[in-house]
């Protein structure tokens, strides 16, 4: 089976259209956030997720609405017909069909090396396995900082490690892990803000949106646009938790100070993987940019837990993307 | 609601509309580029002669026998020379203008013209001798349960397919009149 036949078979068409639909959805959703001046990270996250959810279903849905959508007549009247590119040889040398396959392959490689393999290798706890971990005792600085944050006090574990680090586990036994280095380096108010941020993650873990979104993202492993959109949605999740922490502590400055200290922590270096130093540098820069943006919005007083009022704009954007993608085959 | 608020909302709507317009424009340009780089991709043509001269197709197979119930010239002509030569002619019924006959010729056996006439069931497949050429005749019903038939054969390297919303006997007469 040659490449053209492969791309013209049902799975091939589905992959190509999901790729194109995710690309257009990601671009439009991204620009819509700016155009509509969307500030709430809750709503911004939903905009980014359009490019994660939509392309999984768009092709079968459109075909169900109009079985003739793949016909020559329809293709001649569309906004963009991918089949016009498949047989094209750029400058009579470079075939466009294999170029598309190459783009899909690069996205797949990024998914494998940056997401799937690190998740499979993931070790629980922020420190090395030899570190001693104990439950935070009543009256300890960490336990005191967590008091009265949100109903029942979270389960806290202290990890013997000089590097300042904190993270939460939201599985069957939800808990927050803090290093002794973090407890030592933060003021009580900063420690409270850091724990509040993790409590927000634990509270939100009951919502299946991001879990389902990750399943969709895995299904669209070949799409660069979905990869970027999902990462932006994940970045918004951090901002949502920042905003909740600010709401319960009333101290954006304290959370900003925590982020600034963690930025320089070795524990937040990207874990080793086999994709090479260059890729690690890109990840580190990307992570640092995200943290700096979070610090900036905390400093500017832009944090908000409002999640209403923008649904009409969201609906208009979804409808626009759905109509536009119908004419991308 | 203040004037300032309304103005701001209007600017947001305008900004979003511009975003959509830019994306639509970009898509149209990207759709136009392949045709500009490599002329001869599938397009609509106003006449058989225009398709033949525009794409350098030496022979377009047209039936000598043409039932009176059909309109001439074809209601639609689609043709390409890249990646291989292909021509699709659609003929409408004189009364209601419905497409009832589609003739396609293509220099590739993989060409699927996605014709306006879709078979729902094929009840018979019969090998047929068409003036010394091996043809295959299929008879059955279309989606609206009306009789449909299809016949195909190879004319050298060119595969010819005729699909008609009519019993097979009429289609065979049309196919026989296309022999050279």
Residue map of PLM features:
Chain B
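Surface-exposed amphipathic alpha-helical segments
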Residues: 155-180
């Amino acid at each position: 089976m040659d490449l053209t036949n492969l791309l013209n078979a049902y799975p091939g068409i589905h992959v190509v259209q999901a790729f194109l639909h995710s690309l257009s959805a990601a671009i439009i959703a991204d620009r819509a956030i700016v155009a509509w001046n969307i500030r709430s990270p809750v709503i911004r996250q939903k905009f980014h997720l359009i490019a994660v959810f939509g392309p999984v279903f768009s092709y079968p849905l459109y075909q169900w609405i109009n079985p003739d959508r793949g016909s020559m007549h329809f293709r001649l009247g569309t906004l963009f017909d991918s089949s016009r590119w498949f047989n094209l040889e750029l400058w009579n040398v470079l075939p466009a069909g294999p170029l598309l396959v190459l783009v899909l392959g690069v996205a797949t490689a990024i998914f494998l090396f940056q997401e799937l393999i690190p998740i499979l290798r993931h070790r629980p706890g922020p420190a090395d396995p030899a570190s001693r971990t104990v439950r935070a005792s009543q009256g300890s600085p960490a336990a005191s900082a967590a008091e009265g944050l949100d109903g029942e006090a979270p389960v806290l574990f202290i990890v013997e490690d000089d590097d300042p680090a904190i993270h939460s586990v939201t599985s069957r036994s939800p808990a927050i892990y803090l290093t002794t280095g973090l407890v030592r380096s933060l003021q009580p108010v900063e420690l409270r803000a850091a724990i509040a941020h993790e409590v927000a993650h634990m509270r939100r873990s009951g919502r299946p949106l991001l879990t389902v979104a990750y399943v969709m993202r895995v299904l669209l492993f070949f799409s660069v646009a979905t990869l970027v959109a999902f990462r932006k949605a994940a970045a918004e999740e951090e901002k949502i938790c920042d905003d909740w922490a600010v709401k319960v502590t009333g101290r954006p400055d304290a959370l900003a100070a925590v982020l600034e200290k963690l930025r320089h922590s070795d524990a937040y270096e990207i874990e080793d993987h086999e994709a090479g130093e260059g890729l690690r540098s890109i990840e580190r820069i990307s992570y640092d940019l995200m943290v700096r943006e979070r610090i900036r919005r905390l400093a500017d007083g832009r944090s908000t837990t409002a999640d209403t009022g923008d649904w009409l704009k969201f609906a208009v954007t979804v409808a626009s993307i759905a109509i536009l993608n119908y004419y991308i085959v | 609601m203040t004037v300032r608020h309304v103005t701001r909302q209007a600017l947001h709507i305008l900004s979003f509309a511009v975003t959509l317009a830019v994306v639509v424009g970009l898509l149209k340009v990207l759709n136009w580029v392949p045709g500009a780089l490599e002329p001869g991709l599938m397009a609509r043509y106003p006449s058989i002669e225009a398709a033949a001269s525009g794409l350098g197709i030496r022979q377009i197979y047209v039936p000598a026998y043409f039932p009176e119930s059909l309109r001439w010239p074809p209601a639609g002509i689609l043709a390409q020379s890249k990646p291989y030569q292909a021509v699709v002619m659609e003929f409408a019924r004189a009364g209601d203008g419905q497409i009832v006959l589609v003739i396609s010729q293509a220099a590739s056996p993989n060409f699927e013209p996605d014709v306006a006439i879709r078979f729902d069931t094929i009840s018979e497949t019969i090998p047929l001798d068409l003036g010394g050429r091996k043809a295959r005749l299929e008879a059955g019903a279309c989606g609206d349960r009306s009789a449909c038939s299809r016949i195909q054969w190879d004319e050298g390297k060119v595969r010819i397919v005729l699909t008609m919303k009519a019993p097979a006997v009429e289609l065979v007469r049309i196919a026989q009149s296309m022999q050279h």
